[in-house]
Every structure is written in C-alpha cells, then in structure tokens.
Amino acid sequence: LVTSPVPMNPSKIVCVHLNYSSRVEEFGARLPKAPTYFLKPPSALIRSGEPVVRPRGCRYLNFEGEIVAVIGSRCRGIEPEDAGRFVAGYTVGNDFGLHDFRDTDAGSMLRVKGSDTMCPVLEPVVSGWDFRGRGIRTLVNGEVRQSGNTDEMQWDPHYLIADISRTHTLLPGDLVFTGTPAGSRPVEPGDEVAVEVDGLGRLVNPVVAAEWGIPEGYGAQPSESEEVRSTALGGDWEYRGVRPPRPAAR
C-alpha cells in the first residue's frame, strides 16, 4: 500500500445517494434501478481535526461516514471493469448535511450538503487498497453510531466511477463519495465525530457552533418539518413522537 496527499482542490465532489442495503432498509425505501448523485462544492472541504460548523438556528446537522475514491487520471465513458486503472486510491470522508434546509433545497442539496465545512476528508490517499469486505464505523464521542461493511454496497466504487463517467469527465483529484450505512443522526456542538475504515485510517472532526447565524430578511431559513425529521432521525420514530410516514430517501 502506498499513501499520498489528498488533493484539496478537486474540480468536483460527486456523492451517491442510497447505496448500502442497511440504509435502504432504515428508510423503508426502494433501491433505485440505478445510482443517483449530488455534488458538493470544493469549498466545503476540510481536513481531519478541523471543526465542522453548525450555523445558529440549525438543529439537524447529520454525519455520514463514507469511503471516498480519489480519481488519479482523466476518464470519460469507461467500463466498470476498467475503472480501477483511473483510481489514485481511497480515503475516509464524512458527508455532513444540514437537513434544516431540506424543505427548500431538496432538489439541489446545495445548502444541505454543500455548506462550508460539510465535507471532511482524511489525508492521505491509500493506493492499492482493496475495497471488498471492509468495515466502516462512525463514532460520536467514542460511541459507535454507524457500523457497516462494504459488502452491503449495491454498487461498488468501480461501478459508480464508470457510471458517472458516462456523462461527466472525471479529472485527477476529483472525489467520489460511495454512500453510507444506516445510523446517520444529528450531532451537537461539543461532539466529536470519528469515521474509521479498515485499512484506510481514522477521520476525526469536532463539531462547533458558529459565531454567526443565517441572516434573516431574505433567502431560505432553517426549518423543521416531518420531512426534515424523517430524514435526519431515520428510524427513531419513538424519539420523534410522530407517526412514521413513508419517507423519501435522503
């Protein structure tokens, strides 16, 4: 195995929605026939040890521990069996989301998934790492909140990379987030969130409260609704105190 720095200036960060079977079951959702994706802006990137910032007025800041594929060379229109040749390596990521904006940003996910500090990534990249049969865990203050295995993935990283490349040219340094297992929940300022992946390492970030709030008087504001709660709180119906609806996945 060989390690190298993670490029912190990718042209794009592509994230898959549902991929792990436990996450699909948690939502009572149907697995789509093909992967669906959203983008995070590079400005959301932070390193291990740097704080994830929750704006004032927001309550539903969720973690999602993930494995991240780092593109090593330009690719377009490749086949899944060839995708490994275009991967520089893998690392650990945390696909944080501000679900308080889900009611207004459900289409683009811009503020939900792309706000500042919503994309912690571990350095370095590990090349020669085999993604099959690997454990992934997310811990909050030392307590395991997510625990899964890459064998749960419906589409492995090579499939995802090839699929994305059918319509988007992937460039060196681009990041592909490959999905999260069940157990994503909100965290609070003062919490410490760690993501561990067998053979890749441990990504750790503290959660802090922003000194600034979302300016009022214009633009969308953080909100709370059954849709927000159903996404942020997953299967915790008793905690939410509401009758479970049929939630939309992520």
Identify what each model region corresponds to.
Residues 38, 68-73, 121, 161-162:
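Short, conserved beta-strand element in jelly-roll/cupin
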Residues 24, 48, 78-80, 100-102:
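Short helix/loop capping segments that flank catalytic or ligand/cofactor-binding pockets
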Residues 1-59, 63, 228-230, 237-246:
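Extended, compositionally biased flexible segments
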Residues 11-14, 35-37, 43-44, 51, ...:
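Structural motif
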Residues 5-8, 29-31, 37, 44-45, ...:
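Solvent-exposed alpha-helices and their adjacent loops that cap or buttress functional pockets
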Residues 64-94:
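RNA pseudouridine synthases
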Residues 1-5, 23, 99-250:
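Catalytic-pocket segment enriched in acidic/His residues
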Residues 36-54, 76, 117-124, 182-185:
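Short catalytic-site patches enriched in acidic/histidine residues
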